[in-house]
């Protein structure tokens, strides 16, 4: 894509990306205030660190899901990729590869599996939801082969660094968002939005649609695998099914953050805020004494509302 074509797309993409963010920020702030009232300990360094450690993996998988939703796709393999990342970390870091080698193995697995999935979707023109559903079974099977039951080893110093009493998780999240901002300034990064918003128009403008899709899947796999590594650091071991809840939670967080299913609508900031809102909602309902079943019902109703209200408002404005 040429610089001129990139510039011509930028204004429209920016406007579409930022719709509804102010309302989201207000809702998130209100929930954070309520949470601070119910649990004043979050205002301490230790409390804030513990909260961000619990939120961080959800933020990563929300970003992983948002990457594909912005491109007009979706993945059902987020949870298995989290599990596989945790398993690879726990089975390699205590061996000859060491901590750094284990980290590289986790990152390489996420990138390669994501890129392979993206290539199948892009080059064979298959629906992403079907390919990732099949992939989720394969990835889950590989995780169980590598580690049939919870176990393995994660260095204590790594667990202390990532899941100790310092806000390292929050700093890592800020770093990742900064890197995303830099990536978004490139033609390939802008192409993720353009291809999701209007694939035909993007193709005519010179956007390499297939390459954009493959890169989106690769980065999504990387983020999900790194979330698994962080979870392994939290627990000190690996678990082949620990990522199961993350698939649906990643979709819920992205939707709460205003990321559209049809592509091109939403922001990574929104997805992260959606994950924060979901995390805070779960904690608030816990402190208010909601039973687990009631929490699931409340989460479902809130997510349906998050999707339905903007749609109804849009129709009302159109018919007014």
Protein language model features and the residues they cover:
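Cytosolic-side transmembrane-helix boundaries in multi-pass membrane proteins
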Residues: 1-33, 37, 177-179, 197, ...
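Interfacial loop-to-helix junctions that mark the boundaries of transmembrane helices
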Residues: 13-21, 45-53, 97-101, 157-169, ...
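Hydrophobic alpha-helical transmembrane segments
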Residues: 21-26, 51, 59, 80-84, ...
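Alpha-helical transmembrane segments of multi-pass integral membrane proteins
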Residues: 30, 35, 39, 161-195, ...
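Single transmembrane alpha-helix segments in multi-pass membrane proteins
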Residues: 30-41, 45-96, 120-124, 254-268, ...
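Alpha-helical transmembrane segments within multi-pass membrane transporters and channels
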Residues: 96-137, 273-278
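Transmembrane helix-bundle core of multi-pass membrane transporters
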Residues: 124, 128-186, 212-215, 234-243, ...
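Transmembrane alpha-helical segments in multi-pass inner-membrane proteins
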Residues: 224, 238-300
């Amino acid at each position: 894509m040429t610089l001129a074509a990139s510039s011509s797309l930028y204004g429209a993409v920016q406007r579409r990306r930022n719709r509804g963010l102010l309302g989201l920020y207000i809702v998130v702030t209100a929930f954070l205030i309520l949470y601070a009232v119910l649990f004043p300990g979050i205002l301490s360094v230790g409390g804030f660190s513990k909260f961000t450690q619990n939120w961080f993996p959800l933020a990563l998988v929300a970003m992983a899901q948002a990457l594909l939703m912005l491109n007009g796709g979706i993945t059902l393999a987020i949870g298995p990729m989290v599990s596989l990342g945790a398993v690879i970390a726990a089975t390699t870091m205590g061996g000859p590869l060491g901590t750094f080698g284990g980290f590289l193995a986790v990152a390489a697995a996420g990138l390669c599996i994501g890129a392979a999935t993206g290539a199948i979707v892009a080059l064979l023109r298959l629906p992403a939801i079907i390919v990732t559903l099949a992939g989720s079974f394969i990835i889950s099977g590989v995780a169980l082969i590598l580690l049939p039951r919870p176990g393995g080893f994660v260095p204590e110093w790594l667990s202390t660094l990532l899941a100790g009493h310092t806000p390292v998780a929050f700093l890592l999240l800020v770093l990742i968002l900064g890197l995303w901002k830099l990536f978004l300034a490139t033609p390939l990064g802008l192409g993720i939005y353009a291809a999701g918003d209007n694939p035909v128009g993007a193709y005519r403008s010179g956007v390499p649609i297939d390459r954009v899709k493959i890169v989106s899947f690769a980065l999504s796999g990387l983020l999900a695998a790194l979330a698994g590594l962080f979870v392994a650091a939290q627990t000190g071991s690996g678990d082949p099914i620990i990522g199961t809840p993350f698939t649906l939670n990643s979709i819920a967080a992205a939707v709460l953050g205003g990321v559209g299913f049809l592509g091109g609508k939403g922001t990574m900031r929104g997805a992260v805020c959606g994950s924060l809102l979901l995390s805070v909602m779960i904690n608030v309902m816990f402190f208010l004494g909601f039973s687990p079943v009631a929490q699931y019902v409340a989460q479902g109703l809130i997510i349906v509302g998050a999707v339905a209200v903007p749609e109804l408002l849009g129709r009302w404005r159109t018919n007014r």
